[in-house]
Every structure is written in C-alpha cells, then in structure tokens.
Amino acid sequence: MPVIRFYDGSQQVYEHSVSLIEIIKNKKPSIMKSLIAISVNNHFSNLNTFIREDAFIEFVDQKNYKALNIIRYSCAQLLSYAIKNIWPLAQIATSNIIEDGFYCDIDFKRSISEKDLILLENQMKTLVKREYNILNKLISYSEAREIFQKCFEKYKVSLIDENINCNSKVSLYYHENYADIDIGLQVFNIKFCKYFKLQKIGGVYWKKNKNNKMLQRIYGTAWTNKQELDKHLDYLNELEKRDHRKIGKFLQLYHMQEESPGMIFWHNKGWIIFNELQNFVRVKLKEYKYEEVKTPLLIDKLIWKQSGHWDNYKNAIFTTLSEHREYCIKPMNCPGHVQIFNSRLKSYRDLPIRMAEFGSCHRNEPSGSLHGLMRVRNFTQDDAHIFCTREQVRSEINDCIKMIYDLYSTFHFKKILVKLSTRPEKRIGTDSLWNESEKDLSDMLIENHLSFEYQSGEGAFYGPKIEFILQDSLDRNWQCGTIQLDFYLPLRLSSFYINEKNEKKVPVIIHRAILGSIERFIGILIEECSGNLPTWLSPVQVVIISITDISSGYVKELFKKFSDVNIRIECDLRNEKIGFKIREHTLRRIPYILICGEKESSSKKISVRNRQGHNFGMIDVDFFIKKLQKEIITRNFYQMEE
C-alpha cells in the first residue's frame, strides 16, 4: 500500500502499485498538457513508471519555478545531439546550464562560425518538431563506458572514470538514439524546448586547466514561452547597445591589443575620465583624513611568502627575475602598505593611520575570462588600509561606511545592496574575537540604518567582511566596495605599535575599497549611462559649431573664453551642414552643443542645445558659463534643463 505524498503537502494511499499516469489522472488531470517533468523522491521518472513503495512526488509544469532549469538542461543536450547530427566526428566534452541559459563544450577540428550557429539552431528546431520523448536509463558503469568508447567520446569516458564509482549505476538521458550523461532533470518530451536561441561562441580549457586542450563553447538561452524569450533578447540587445567596449572604441577612449592581453592603452579622452574619477576620490580622501602613498610595483617574493599571498594566490601573480632575485609584480597593495607602517616605530597616539593608494596591480587572469575594462590583468585599485587599535575599529568602520555612501551618491545607482560575510570553517582567531568583530560590523550597519544580508561562512579566514553591491538600471549587480577586518596580515608581517603601558601590540588592519578597480568602474559607468557621462566626467564638455565662415572669428573668441575657465571645449569649423554636425556631436555624447551663426555673432550670445536634443534657445554667454561651471564643480549627475 504505497503512500504518495505531494509537493503541496497532501497525500494519497493506494492499495496496490500504481503508475504515474494513474496518479496524475487521480490527482490533477488538467496538468497533463503542460506537464514537463515528474520528480519521484527528487529523481526524474518516466510517465510509465510504477510506484510500489511510499514516495514523494512533484509535478513540474511550465509555471513551476523549476521548469526553466529543466528546459535548459534539455536544451543543452539537444544542442549536443544537433552537433553530433551535423558533425559526427565532433567530440562533446561537457554541457550544462548557466544563468539565463546553457552551453556545450566541443572539441572540433575547425573554428565554429556565426553561420554554424544558424545551422545548429535550425537543426535543433527540426529535432524539436519530431516531439520525441526523452528517456532516462540507469545502467552499469561498464555499459556506460562501453557506449561512449564505441562513439569515440573520450571526454565522456574520462568523466565517468573520474566521477563515478565502478560499482555504481550511471544515469543517461536518451534523445532518440543519442545518449548523454545525466547533467540534470529533463523534460518528458522535446516539444517543450521550442523557445531557445544560440548566442555566441567562446573558448574554454578542458576542466579549466590551461595545460589542457582549448575547447569551443557554444552558448544559448532558453525560456518557457516566446514572450519571455523575446523579452530576454530585447534585454540583450539593450546590453549590446550599452557595451562599454563598443562605446569606448567609438568614442576613442581606449583600446586593447593582442600583444598586451588584459592591459589597457588609454587614449587622451579615456585618460581624462580616469583622472577626473581619481581626482574625485582624492577629494574624498582628504575630506576623510587619509594619507596617500605610493608603493613599488616590484617587491621581493619573500614578502609575498611572509604575507601568505604566495601560498594562496601564486597562480595569479606575475613574477620577474633580476640579478638572481625573484620579484612579484604586485597583485594588491596591502603588503606594501604594511612595509610603510613598519618603517618606523608607532605609538598608540599615532593611530589610526589611514593609508590610501591608487595602486597599479597586475593579476594573471585566464585569457578566456578577460572582458574589456571589466576583467583585466592590469588595473588600478583605489583601496586603503587603516591601521588601528581594537577599540578604534567601530568608529573607523562607521567612517568607512559614510565615505562609501558619500561617494556612491554622486552616481545615482538604482540601489546599493549590502552583504555581511561571516566566519568560515577554516579560520584564525578565537570565537570570542570573531563574535566581537562580526558584531562590530553588523552594529555599524544597523546604526547607519542599512538593511543587509548575511553570507554565512563567506568571510575570509582572517576576518569578516562587508560587501557593497551597486545595482544598475538594467538590474545587474556590481560588487565594488568592501570593508574587511584583518587580524592576520599584521601578525604575519610583524607589525606592532607601543600601547599606553609601553607594551608591543599588534594593530588591526581594515581593508577598504570603494570603486574597487577604477578601470572596471569606468566600464560600469559607461554602460549605466550608455556613454552619456555626466558633464564633469565627459572628455569634451562643450563643442562650438559654426553655421557659416562669417561666424568663425566669434567661434574662436568663444573657444578662448571657455578654455580660460578650464572648460573642456572643441570647435567645429568644417564646411558641413548644421544638421550633420549636430547629429555627429550628439553621437559623440558631448553634453552641450553651442551653435554660432550671424545672429549669435552680432548679438554676442550663443544658441545652446544638450545631447538629449533640448534646445535652450539663444542665451548670454557669461550666464551659460556660470551655470555650466556650477554643474561641473558640484559634479551634478544630470544636465541643466533651463
């Protein structure tokens, strides 16, 4: 007498073994048309399966929150099936789901092109039209191995050998005659996989090991209905329009090249943005009483061993040799700041010491992960390290929080999310020290009226951490700011101060970052603003365009007037139609376009319009300059409207 329990908490008793079809007809016959999968005791089951013992059953229809991943798992292996149909000699390595989609890694003799994606997508659509049932089978280790050996699928054989015990069963899914290793619950019938799109091709090392073969990864997205798919594709189109790499190239801000992967060649206009942002942070550093320092790019490997960074991050650290001595190209600033702290004896009266640096850091990121300004190998950290006593921690944390929010408020992000990462299993320090430290951070967040989410066990082994995540207008989250307590590094690098009892005491270090990486933050801003940066950050703030040659003298006069008050200005005296000039400079995202013709020259005024197309009409030059200066000095995020 099997007792069947359902996801909604109800249960039903049967006097004999019963098929899943019969259970559905008794429980919820209306679900049959939209039923994509059934889970029995958290495992996929076929409709014809008979239940002979007590079981927990969940019906998954298209409205169920689990449906999306089930469809994506199915699409991932549908793609694998399509690949084998078109290119029988291609070897499937792995397939899986990711956020918003799925992927398949393949080993193939030639590079896959955009045209190939269309070919594969059409093949997938053809297979979906067959409306075949997807079958799940449990077979022995040796049977599974034999199936993939016969197909010359060496990657599948490798996965079975490494991940499955030889005495265990192997779960396979069958798309018609194509067999693949179970990666996740799939739909009953392929007809539920209509709404997908293949998107792009990338490269990835087998098992993420750069010593292994480079595979080709095909990415796709899949949804439960056409509306959701179209909505997602529209979102991706918007992302593409805002892509900082395209905008950066069009506006001539920077470029990158193969001879220096992950390194940025800043052009003049991009470097203006960089310096303006850096100078803004400098103003805040002065306001919050930080001292700015500069530490060497090369530091002996011995320091990095002492700090513990070599043991934990050596694969990401670039090194170089000179006179039989090995140096590390610094991946972070903290050990260098500790050297400055250690360079002379400190008293408790000297603390807190707030040390900031715009440090040029290098990290050996995998080439496949590099992405414009967002993921680079050389970046500028705006971090700081506060050396303080245990008693000063709370007030310093409080000031860090205020500084972070003060700076972020300038950029008007949609939302700031806050997360508090607490002690991991492997850690240093006593439980009482961790209790105090975590309470210090949480109390300061509460005192500042900030709601936050706990990330249990996600802190570093040397201390808890607060993360500040910026949410942009497209609902993407960017983790930028951090406040991290560290009891470990000063101990490792023998830092101490003399307390009021004339005893040596180890200081606490607070690691603090606001922008994180200046390069990455510029990329975030470009995408958030679609390249329409606020006037104070814009490389060119004003362009003056002439209507006729007659007004060129007045244009030059205006150019000098604006330049003399440090407004970044350009002239356009070309013999082109005025509409063409306006359109071109609007596309260049220049905040204000000044138009000068005979009327403006004779009245000594200017006609002003902004890049949104708002026309201010003809106004007094000095009045406009004052308004513009105010907008720049106050770092207003929005342009003047009147």
Swiss-Prot record:
BP terms from Gene Ontology: threonyl-tRNA aminoacylation
Segments of this protein annotated with the region Catalytic: 243-534
Keyword list, A-Z: Aminoacyl-tRNA synthetase, ATP-binding, Cytoplasm, Ligase, Metal-binding, Nucleotide-binding, Protein biosynthesis, RNA-binding, tRNA-binding, Zinc
SMART domains in UniProt: tRNA_SAD
Chief location of this protein within or outside the cell: cytoplasm
Top EC category: ligase
Listed GO CC annotations: cytosol
E.C. numbers: 6.1.1.3
Subcellular location per the Swiss-Prot or TrEMBL entry: Cytoplasm
Cofactors that this protein relies on: Zn(2+)
Entries under InterPro entries matching the protein: aa-tRNA-synt_IIb, aa-tRNA-synth_II, aa-tRNA-synth_II/BPL/LPL, Anticodon-bd, Anticodon-bd_dom_sf, Beta-grasp_dom_sf, TGS, Thr-tRNA-ligase_IIa
Catalysed reactions, semicolon-separated: tRNA(Thr) + L-threonine + ATP = L-threonyl-tRNA(Thr) + AMP + diphosphate + H(+)
Positions of Zn(2+) binding: C334, H385, H511
Cofactor remark: Binds 1 zinc ion per subunit.
Claim: Protein transport is one of the keywords in the record: no
One of the record's GO molecular function terms: threonine-tRNA ligase activity
NCBIfam families: thrS
HAMAP family reported in the protein's UniProt record: Thr_tRNA_synth (MF_00184)
Quaternary assembly: Homodimer.
Role of this protein: Catalyzes the attachment of threonine to tRNA(Thr) in a two-step reaction: L-threonine is first activated by ATP to form Thr-AMP and then transferred to the acceptor end of tRNA(Thr). Also edits incorrectly charged L-seryl-tRNA(Thr).
Similarity annotation: Belongs to the class-II aminoacyl-tRNA synthetase family.
Name of protein: Threonine--tRNA ligase
Gene: thrS
